[in-house]
Amino acid sequence: MEAKPFLIKPNQEELEDLTGKKFNSLSEVVDAAKEIVNTGIENVMVTLGGDGAVLVTKDKVYKGTFPKVEIKNTVGSGDSTIAGMAYGLSVDKPMDECFRLAVACGTTNAMVDSTGSIDHEILKDILPKIIIEEI
């Protein structure tokens, strides 16, 4: 990738297309994201559908998971995820908290019928239930 953006957010399928590899484990996804970070892109956040997401930075790797929820519509969840990350960054939250907000926004979007929509009451309920762990 010629441009060196601060952050990219592929889902697993998009990461496979980008790298030309098929992933069978989380460690393979993380390794591919690390390779991308080593090219000069500072952060790679990969969404994994029902398995949460992973964020690879130059110094750390985080895994984000969400509680079992009723999924109504996943359209727009990736956009909602990146919006949560962007908001967190814009208010100078630490990277792990930005990632928590990102996962919470993507999850919240999937819980409502409308596309690319966040219900703030659901978000407030989900946010503390998001588990972020350094791996």
Predicted stretch roles:
Residues M1-V29:
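Conserved beta-alpha-beta core of the PfkB/ribokinase-like small-molecule kinase fold
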Residues L26-I135:
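Conserved phosphate-binding/catalytic region of the ribokinase-like
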